[in-house]
Regions:
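Interhelical loop and adjacent transmembrane-helix boundary motif
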Residues: 77-78, 232-280
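Transmembrane alpha-helical segments of polytopic membrane transport and secretion proteins
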Residues: 1-45, 290-302
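Glycine/proline-centered hinge or cleavage motifs at structural transition points of membrane proteins
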Residues: 136, 194-195, 208
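C-terminal transmembrane helix and the adjacent membrane-cytosol boundary/short C-terminal tail
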Residues: 177-181, 219, 259-302
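Periplasmic/extracellular loop-to-transmembrane helix junction in inner-membrane transport proteins
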Residues: 22-41, 55-98, 118, 259-270
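Transmembrane alpha-helices
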Residues: 176, 198-234
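Transmembrane-helix boundary motif in ABC transporter permease subunits
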Residues: 98-129, 142, 291-296
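Generic hydrophobic transmembrane alpha-helix motif, especially the helices
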Residues: 130-166
Length: 302
């Protein structure tokens, strides 16, 4: 006995639903392509200023970046050549002082916000830190001038390091807090379940897990204050010679660049361009270190 099974009938004519949705599909693809193009243009616009600045600094200042620039003191007016050796050394001295002041206070403040503080107290501390992050740098300089320079009766490297360190504190503190909050709570709970004291768990487990993130925040803060000029005008003031005591004025690359840029001498202008290029390379080097640290952390987490 033969059995016939009816087969479904397919039509080659497109359905009305397909005819209505096909244009919508093309329109969605067009909007997606348009959005990609707009975001690409915006990304290029973000990178373009850095490329233009770097190109102009290389064009104007690279010719003056020779061995003398890194090893010699500034020459008097009318003499060509010379360098910014004292300003380069002064910049690292100021950054070292800033790190000594800003890193411990900022890191411990971030630990308090993440591990110990109450919600209301934390809100006020975060609010104060965010406000301090937005305070103009010249205001920092005026405050330290009144509190440090005037009582000491003179500008000094110590005052310059203090103002940069104070500017670092809120940024390091907020970065440390955010990094510590990324550590899974399971680490804390496991440590407490084993009877480990909370402070020891924070120091040896939580902080160690977030160490690279904390270092990243410190480097970002150093990169930010490395190019500050206004607060140093009120504190370090500048010096054309080597500084042997922290109680004496000290040269710094931003100050030297500023002094040379406003001068009427062409040779000093070239030195200013070279100094600006060297300062930009320093900041780029610090930021490159930050990228290496964060990339390694993200790859290991992945």
């Amino acid at each position: 006995m033969e059995c016939w099974i009816p087969l479904p009938q397919y039509s080659t004519t497109p359905s009305p639903h397909f005819l209505m949705t096909a244009p919508n599909h093309r329109w969605r693809k067009f909007k997606n392509a348009l959005m990609q193009a707009v975001t690409l243009v915006c990304a290029i616009l973000v990178v373009t200023p850095l490329v233009l600045v770097f190109y102009h600094l290389v064009k104007e200042g690279f010719s003056s970046m020779n061995w003398a620039f890194f090893t010699q003191l500034p020459k008097p007016v009318g003499e060509t050549g010379g360098g910014m050796a004292n300003a380069i050394a002064g910049t690292f001295i100021l950054l070292g002082q800033a790190a000594v002041l800003g890193v411990p206070i900022g890191v411990l403040g971030g630990v308090f916000l993440s591990e110990y503080g109450t919600s209301r107290l934390n809100w006020w501390i975060r609010f104060a830190a965010d406000v301090l992050n937005g305070v103009p740098s010249i205001t920092w300089g005026m405050v330290v001038y009144a509190l440090v320079v005037v009582p000491m009766k003179g500008f000094s490297a110590l005052a310059g390091g203090i103002v940069l360190g104070l500017m670092m504190i809120p940024l390091v503190m907020r970065t440390t807090e955010e990094v510590l909050q990324l550590v899974p709570n399971g680490y804390r709970e496991a440590a407490l379940a084993l009877g480990i004291a909370k402070w020891r768990a924070v120091v040896q487990i939580v902080a160690r897990t977030a160490l690279k993130g904390i270092v990243t925040g410190v480097l970002l803060a150093l990169a930010r204050v490395a190019g500050e000029t206004a607060p140093l005008l009120f504190t370090a003031f500048g010096n054309h010679f080597w500084t042997h005591k922290l109680t004496d004025p000290i040269a710094a690359m931003p100050l030297q660049i500023f002094a040379y840029a406003i001068s009427p001498y062409d040779d000093w202008h070239r030195q200013a361009w070279a100094g600006a290029l060297a300062l930009l390379l320093l900041v780029l080097f610090i930021n490159a270190g930050v990228r290496v640290l964060t990339r390694d952390r993200f790859q290991r987490n992945a």
